[in-house]
Amino acid sequence: MSKVDVVDILKKSDALLEGHFLLSSGKHSNRYVQCAKVLRFPEYAAEVLSTVVEQIKDLDIDLVVGPAMGGVIVSYELGRQLGKEAVFTERKDNTMELRRGFEVKKGAKIIIAEDVVTTGKSTMETKRVLEALGGEVVGVACIADRTNHDIGMPIYSAIKLDIQVYESDECPLCKEGKLPVVKPGSREFKELGM
C-alpha cells in the first residue's frame, strides 16, 4: 500500500475547516476537524484508519470500543481491519455506559477508538467504564490527535494536529471582529447555556 496522505483526505472530504470556531470546552480556535466528513466515505475511512491499524496491530487487542457518537464508525472500521470485535459506549443520563448487551471479558485488552482526541474527556470516561468491568485499556486510537497534554495513555493517530486554541476573552479572531464564531461538533454546551 502506498503512503496515505491523511491531510489530503481531510481536505478532499471537507473535514479540515478554517474559520472561527467555538469548541465544546468553551475555547475558540481558527481550525476545526470534522471527522464525520471523512467517515461518510467508506474508502476514506478505511484508508485513513489503515495508518492507525499499522501502529496497533501488534498490541494483541481483544476488543475495540468507541464512545458514541464519534467513535462508533472508527471502532467498527478498526475492528474490521484488525479482525476484532467492535462495540461502543454511550451516554445515559449524562453518564458513559456500556449498554445494548455488550460485554467486556475480565482481562480483555482494549483499544479505545475515537474520531478526534482533544481534551481526552470522553476517552477517560470510557476508560473508567471499561476498567470497572475488568478490561485493560492499552491506549486510544484515533484519526486526529489534537491533544497538547498527556492524557495518561498512549495515543495512536493517523495525524497529529497542532491547532491553536484561545480562551474566549483572549481570542485574536474575536478582537479582529471579521469572522463570526461558529459552533461545530455534536457535544452540548451546557456551561455556556447554548
Curated annotation (Swiss-Prot):
One of its GO terms (molecular function) is orotate phosphoribosyltransferase activity. One of its GO terms (biological process) is 'de novo' UMP biosynthetic process. Keywords: Glycosyltransferase, Magnesium, Pyrimidine biosynthesis, Transferase. InterPro entries: OPRT, Orotate_PRibTrfase_bac, PRibTrfase_dom, PRTase-like. It catalyses: orotidine 5'-phosphate + diphosphate = orotate + 5-phospho-alpha-D-ribose 1-diphosphate. 5-phospho-alpha-D-ribose 1-diphosphate binds at residues 114-122. The keyword Membrane does not apply. It holds the Pfam family Pribosyltran. It comes from the Bacteria. The keyword Magnesium applies. Homodimer. Catalyzes the transfer of a ribosyl phosphate group from 5-phosphoribose 1-diphosphate to orotate, leading to the formation of orotidine monophosphate (OMP). This is Orotate phosphoribosyltransferase. The lineage of its organism: Bacteria, Bacillati, Bacillota, Clostridia, Peptostreptococcales. The gene is pyrE.
